């Protein structure tokens, strides 16, 4: 029971933070993933693509209906402690550095394309163009620019470039 409550709490924090990022970057066209503002906590429903669904769980004490994506003070404290723990964990940092040194979002091996994640496609199977900070990319070019931003998110000393890279990492993982 405690595990379920912890999972629910951290999931709500995740949805709030994702919602903030999606609102900050409308060019990513991910608005359909923001659902907290579509919830009616009094009725216990959520509207998804114009259809109203009942919620299985109606207890969301940390969601403010007037500002559903705002973290509570306690949630913010959890996020800050998690960030500190991740940044200061040498084993994790060593692992991340290894992945960035040896890894890639894609690789061609023995004539086969190995890739991480999903490749955005149109209905006809052609590559979908994705807007990344005002520029459109698709296919290999998209993966190259995403990898570029992943590395900036970790290595860049410029605060703005680092933030852009981290935003990309968070939204596309």
Identify the function of each model-found stretch.
Residues 1-171:
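Feature recognizes metal-dependent phosphohydrolase scaffolds
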């Amino acid at each position: 029971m405690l595990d379920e409550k912890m999972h629910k709490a951290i999931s709500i924090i995740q949805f709030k933070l994702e919602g903030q990022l999606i609102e900050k970057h409308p060019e990513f066209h991910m608005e359909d993933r923001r659902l907290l503002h579509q919830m009616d906590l009094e009725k216990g429903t959520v509207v998804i693509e114009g259809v109203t669904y009942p919620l299985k769980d109606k207890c969301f004490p940390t969601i403010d209906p007037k500002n559903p994506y705002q973290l509570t003070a306690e949630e913010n404290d959890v996020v800050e402690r998690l960030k500190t723990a991740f940044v200061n964990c040498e084993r994790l940092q060593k692992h991340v550095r290894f992945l960035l040194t040896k890894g890639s979002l894609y690789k061609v091996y023995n004539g086969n394309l190995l890739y991480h994640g999903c490749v955005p496609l149109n209905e006809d199977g052609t590559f979908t163009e994705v807007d990344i900070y005002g520029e459109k990319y698709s296919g290999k070019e998209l993966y190259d620019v995403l990898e570029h931003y992943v590395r900036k998110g970790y290595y860049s000393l410029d605060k703005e470039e680092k933030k852009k890279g981290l935003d990309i990492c968070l939204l596309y993982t």
